[in-house]
Amino acid sequence: MNYSHIIDDMTWSYSRITTYEDCPYRFYLKYIKKLKGEPLFFSDYGSFMHLIIQKYLTGELTREELPTYYLANFRKSVIGKAPNLAIFQNYFRQGLEYLRNIQPPEDEILGVEKEISFTLGEKKFIGYIDKVSRSDGIDITDNKSRASKPRTLRKRPTKSDKELDQFLRQLYIYSISVMNEYGEFPKHLIFNCFRTQTSIVEPFDLENFKNTEKWALDTIDCISKETEWKPNIEWFRCKYLCDCNSQCEYFQMFGGDA
């Protein structure tokens, strides 16, 4: 069934678009049926770390207070169940180590968890930039729990290079708002991969920006024309990355929690 009458009035975000790319049926459950999602370990953990970093950058917590806050609030903030004990222990330890080693920012902070709204074509968008800062130009930073890797610069892009390019689309979309507010595009797009204490710094590229704009609008057009809403079933991803899995009949038929 086609739901263009609902979709055409939507306010878009990077996550809404990528939800459709990951699984059209999940998009249907979340944004057409508007089902409420359930807690998941990876998303809970990421949100918790984002909150702590935000509190530090805004001065609500001092550097010395971060580990204590983390330990005191981890269990009540990270509710979802990890796939196994080893993953839980690694994530817990790496988050604590990052907060113990965190360094004061050297650049001028212009915004933290900055809410943005803008238009792309005729489509309304919203988003949140984890950090907007200025050094020799404007930089935008996304805090990531994923252990992404810096670009290899090989002639033939590796799997991790291609994955990085996909993640960069979020920051390229946010760059529209930066241009609208500051009159210039970001100089750098940065991922703060806090679990591995790795900073990935990519220069803004106008061609990649234009390609991202086209990708976003083309995907929205596909969503507007969608009629089948097919599921994309892969057990681990469905179980631990989809907050609608308990309400998805396809996942239950596939085996569910068995």
Residue ranges with predicted function:
Residues 1-258:
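RecB-family 4Fe-4S metal-dependent nuclease core
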